[in-house]
Regions:
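Active-site Tyr-X1-5-Lys
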Residues: 49, 66-68, 81-107, 112, ...
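Conserved Rossmann-fold NAD(P)-dependent oxidoreductase catalytic core, especially the SDR/UDP-sugar
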Residues: 15, 34, 41-83
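Amphipathic terminal alpha-helices
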Residues: 230-237
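Catalytic Tyr-X3-Lys loop
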Residues: 14, 18-19, 26-37, 41, ...
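Short-chain dehydrogenase/reductase
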Residues: 31-33, 76, 81-92, 123-130, ...
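Glycine/proline-rich active-site loop of Rossmann-fold NAD(P)-dependent oxidoreductases
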Residues: 89, 114-130, 138-140, 145, ...
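Conserved Rossmann-fold cofactor-binding substructure of NAD(P)-dependent oxidoreductases
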Residues: 1-12
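C-terminal "lid/loop" region of Rossmann-like NAD(P)-dependent oxidoreductases
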Residues: 147, 177-178, 186-193, 197-216
């Protein structure tokens, strides 16, 4: 009830709010589920009651886990390794249900390792690019988790924004999931090489994917969206 007035007269809702880190979710699963599942249900219900046209929901590539091999497609099985990915994929199901049952148009995005301006730069669980940049700036060793051979599909925040805007203009794909990535993977150790500097290995962490790379065919086809920012070009800037 508290959030319903905020949805009055709104056409599009971009739902990005979440408890959004894997390791803190492992430490406090109840909080992660309550915030991410309950919060998403609140957003969808308020949108339905106030006549919102469409909800864009931000989910995670962590849904693919370890059982699926890149490139990762939206029709692959879910393999949730931690409470965070469980809570976010539950939100995906809620979005589909609100589309099927109530006719609320929803679009779900699975983001692949978003980076860019205003990214968190400190803390044990800050995204790796921001963390490495801050460590290097401070003259510290960059902390590589495990052997560093794990790969990620790093996606610039501007491309994420463009995907959300594109979703306000599409005419199909409601209740469905769309990967938002670049379709290219880079290892953490190669990222260190791009940044330059000394590093140290730290122990592996539980509940994290090994390799990620998005198949973005569906977003290209239905949303008419393409990634424009490459990691190499952004680092040069």
């Amino acid at each position: 009830n508290k959030i319903e007035p905020l949805f009055e007269g709104v056409d599009f809702v971009f739902h990005l709010a979440a408890e959004s880190r894997i390791q803190p979710a492992i430490e406090n699963p109840t909080q992660s589920v309550e915030i991410n599942v309950g919060g998403t249900c609140n957003v969808l219900q308020a949108s339905r009651l106030k006549g919102v046209k469409r909800v864009m929901y931000s989910s995670t590539s962590a849904a693919y886990g370890l059982k699926n091999k890149p490139p990762l497609r939206e029709d692959m099985i879910k393999d949730c390794l931690n409470p965070y990915s469980i809570s976010k994929t539950a939100g995906e199901e809620l979005c589909k249900m609100y589309t099927d049952l109530f006719g609320l148009e929803t679009i779900t995005f699975r983001y692949f390792n978003v980076y860019g301006e205003r990214q968190p730069l400190k803390g044990q669980y800050a995204p790796v690019i921001g963390l490495f940049m801050k460590q290097k700036e401070n003259g510290e060793l960059m902390t590589v988790v495990g052997d560093g051979l794990q790969t990620r599909d790093f996606t610039h925040v501007k491309d994420v924004v463009r995907a959300n805007i594109a979703a306000t203009k599409c005419t199909s794909g409601f209740g469905e999931i769309f990967n938002i990535g670049t379709g290219k993977q880079i290892s953490v150790i190669d990222l260190v090489g791009l940044l330059g500097g000394e590093y140290v290995h730290i122990p592996e962490r539980l509940g994290e994917c090994r390799f990620t790379e998005a198949d973005i065919t569906k977003a290209r086809t239905i949303l008419k969206w393409e990634p424009k920012v490459t990691l190499v070009d952004w680092l040069k800037e």
